Regions:
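Glycine-rich active-site loops that engage anionic ligands at enzyme catalytic sites
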Residues: 2-249
Length: 249
């Protein structure tokens, strides 16, 4: 699959995925237009309130619809889902939700910051500017609870993963792996190049909705200082910090 934009969508297929799920396959490439089509399909399915659907899991170019076969028969769910994917979703008019995520770049929080800048042939200041000037689309969640696979990374910042992955990466670490960037939501092993860290909790099991950002939404990183990092960390720990977001479109 390749990143890219096209004006037309190839035929969408609805496939059987075991005895309690359907897999909707969209055009098999990675692109914002494909992702918008997936998000629009999720929205339509929710609006239909089809009894028996228990979960929907979006990926780069597909949507897994899980259902309870004791509540709705295969023939019925297949018919209704197939009808929905044929509908005009008007994806161009969808709103864009953007989360503002603070990041302390470099230093102890970004041990690979200098390497990424050197690999790109740019200064540290330019690395921060390039990484923090875009809104990144959350194509999907995976690998870990709340781990965001983000698209739109400046090509100059594309950096190979570590040859020897780290045994433990602190929660909140912001990394680059190949053509993608993302945030580690919990302490975990990992092989991405770490350029900074956010004090924000991307995953909080104590909350009713533990995952902060959902697939189809956007993340905008903005640089902060050491003192701001310490202040926000304290506010997060005491439960007095709310991550800012806005809508566009």
């Amino acid at each position: 699959m390749k990143f890219g934009e096209r004006k037309t969508m190839e035929k969408i297929r609805v496939l059987t995925a075991g005895d309690s799920a359907l897999l909707i396959q969209f055009e098999q490439r990675i692109g914002e237009d494909v992702n918008r089509r997936i998000s629009a399909t999720v929205k339509l399915l929710k609006m239909q309130q089809i009894e028996g659907i228990v979960d929907m899991i979006p990926a780069y170019a597909s949507l897994l619809v899980q259902y309870n076969p004791l509540v709705i028969r295969y023939e019925e769910i297949y018919k209704r889902v197939s009808a929905i994917v044929k509908m005009d979703t008007k994806v161009e008019s969808m709103e864009k939700k953007v989360w503002e995520i603070p990041v302390l770049y470099g230093g102890e929080q970004g041990p690979d910051f200098s390497y990424v800048a050197e690999h790109a042939g740019i200064s540290g200041e330019e690395l921060i500017r390039l990484h923090s000037e875009k809104d990144y689309l959350v194509y999907m969640l995976g690998f870990l609870p709340g781990f965001t696979y983000l698209g739109g990374l400046e090509e100059k910042l594309h950096t190979p993963r570590l040859e020897n992955p780290r045994v433990k990466i602190p929660a909140g670490s912001v990394g680059i792996g190949g053509s993608q960037t993302g945030v580690y939501p919990v302490d975990s092993p990992g092989g991405w190049q770490l350029i900074g860290r956010t004090p924000v909790k991307m995953y909080d099991p104590e909350k009713q909705d533990p995952i902060l950002v959902q697939a189809g939404e956007y993340i905008h990183f903005y640089p902060i200082t050491d003192s701001e990092y310490a202040r926000i960390s304290e506010a997060v720990a005491s439960g007095n910090y709310s991550v800012q977001w806005h809508k566009e479109g």
